Regions:
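Well-ordered beta-strand positions enriched in small/hydrophobic/aromatic, beta-favoring residues
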Residues: 31, 63-65, 85
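Hydrophobic beta-strand signal
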Residues: 48-51, 64
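Short, flexible active-site-adjacent loop segments at beta-strand->alpha-helix junctions, enriched
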Residues: 3, 55, 89
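Short acidic low-complexity segments
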Residues: 51-58
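Short, positionally conserved secondary-structure boundary motifs
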Residues: 1-44, 59, 70-71, 78-82, ...
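PDZ-domain C-terminal substructure recognizer with occasional recognition of PDZ-binding tails
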Residues: 72-96
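Short aromatic-glycine motifs in intrinsically disordered, low-complexity regions
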Residues: 65-66, 93-102
Length: 119
């Protein structure tokens, strides 16, 4: 599948290709990144990010997040009554959710590693 590293894209479960996962990474699925919002974390356009399914992540961890049917990859920060999805590129604004908006945000899993696309 694919995940946005920029503006969220429609979340679809599909197999695009099979990838070899490095032996030291324990994951449930992988996604191809599209965009440049996570470049300062070392995740670039077309990189493959490995996701371990879990409904929560620690403050500041990178996660695959579904927002009202769309998916994005961001650092997650929790504050009382607020969830912030923070890009790792100053060209992008944080995505801040409060109150009823929080019901639309679902952590799909934690990014446990990634490999760079060479092409």
């Amino acid at each position: 599948g694919s995940i946005a590293c920029g503006e969220p894209i429609t979340a679809e479960q599909n197999i695009e290709k099979m990838v070899d996962v490095p032996e030291n990474i324990r994951c449930d699925f992988s996604l191809t990144c599209h965009g440049d919002s996570m470049v300062d974390a070392g995740i670039h356009d077309k990189d493959v990010v490995y996701i371990r399914i879990q409904p929560e992540v620690e403050n500041g961890e990178i996660a695959a997040v579904r927002i009202d049917g769309e998916a994005t990859l961001k650092r997650v920060y929790y504050n009382p009554g607020t969830l912030t999805l923070m890009p790792a590129n100053p060209a992008y604004a944080p995505m801040i959710y409060t109150g009823p908006q929080l019901e639309e945000v679902h952590i799909e899993g934690k990014a446990v590693g990634w490999t760079h696309w060479v092409g």
